Amino acid sequence: MSESRSRPTYTGDIASRGIDRAQEYSVETQEIAFTDDQHAIWEDLFAGVHRPLLLEHVCRSFLDGLARLELDPTRIPTVAYLNERIQRRTGWRIERTAVRYTQADDWYRKFAQRIFLITDYLRTRGQMEFTPEPDMFHDIFGHLPYLTQDFYARIEDRFAPAYLNATPEEKEVIKRLAWYSTEFGVVVEDGRFKVFGAGTISGRAELANTIMEFYRLSRDKVIDYHGAVYEQLQGHFLARQADIRRIIAGVDALHRQGQMSSQADGWNVVQVLYRDLGIARDGLLGGGVILAPFDVEVIAKLPKTVYAFNPMFFVCESFEQMENLLDSYLKPIARRGA
């Protein structure tokens, strides 16, 4: 990536490699002059996800936001372009960061100012299906369509006041709640499971595999999409709760041992645990991932799988339910000491 000599050089390096803190974040006027090759990667990423057979399984709010954002499928947008379409609608604004994976404390301090950070890092040709670190395609295509809408701005507004007032243990839970909602959440819409999370939407391989699980649940007669799908999911989850607790404990143990650091390990970890724990692979637990009702206590026990595919996706019956469940944990922390 290159810029004029009067502007900082954004390298995409991780912060610990010595980035000058004064240049860690930019303002909207500091734009990057992307190469033709970088625009071509953006174009191919956009085309790879922007397909009717995939987008029909993505929630309406994302599609509405994508229409509002009016992204050019062939060119990486400028920060100024993004701010013009977002700030007037929800009050949030965009800043670019030279950090590939921003530390949570810095992230939520920016959130408190209603600033959403996008990295200057763009995945390579070898990472088109999956990138272990969030890149600018993930940040822009995955998240920013939602930030044109008040309901999503309200969801994001909940996190910073709680995080900045939380204990270290509570901070870890808050990070997991954000991960399994805005990054990898699923919502019920029109009697179907629909992808909501930006991490899933912006990763072609994970999006396709998640959609395949939606189909498997119907094929194996686990979920009848003519009935109340959320209630069915709750029933199956309760029936297999003991096994699911063992799987979550197993995922946590693998995470602590550093054994979830690759794409293959992340996707296959559930199947490995079924084998090692002697859990039958059938019904709700018959696929490569597990769908579960959104539950704060369950999510608190499941680590983020940053460098791997997610083993579990949590489902909300509606966005209103998601807001209420997040409030049940976040509001008391945010108000503490007030």
Where are these regions (language model features)?
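The feature captures two recurrent sequence modes
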Residues: 1-147, 151, 265-286, 291-338
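A contiguous, surface-oriented mixed alpha/beta subdomain in the mid-to-C-terminal portion of proteins
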Residues: 126-327
